[in-house]
Amino acid sequence: KTVCTVGKIDDIFAHRGITRSNHTHDNASSCDAALKFLKDDFEGLLFVNLIEFDMIYGHRNDPRGYGDALEAFDRKLPELEAQLRTTDLVIIAADHGVDPTTPGTDHTREHIPLLAFGPRINCKINLGIRETYSDVAATIAENFHLPPPSFGSSFLSSLVPDSPSISP
């Protein structure tokens, strides 16, 4: 399978295990790059980092900018959704919490957002508070018929109850 990355993901993984990358530096160009990869109709993983939420707004204590960036991303989601194939799974999460309204610039929250959607996804469920962030990795592994990681529990069956996996 192909592994495409957008943003600083290539640096985070030392350019290992990546088939194609587009190293972007802001949310808008990251969204545009993601849309371009989706239009290429590849089979595999598209891993996108939206750097501004963390670097520009979260760690810089800018709640208004953070809110504006969220609204801009929300406006891009319909475009992304329109490019999805019937078997695609989108997972939106953060790697940590940074509350831009609190004093200091360190990570502030244990819990992060976790949203999943796609054409075959049961979007009317609450995944609850997951035991570990590794659940995302376990879900991706199951989706691609890979061995489960040592940690984490897949929530794929909650998203697509009638199918053990959604990717061919």
Predicted segment positions?
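Feature captures the catalytic ectodomains and active-site-proximal regions of enzymes
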Residues: 1-168
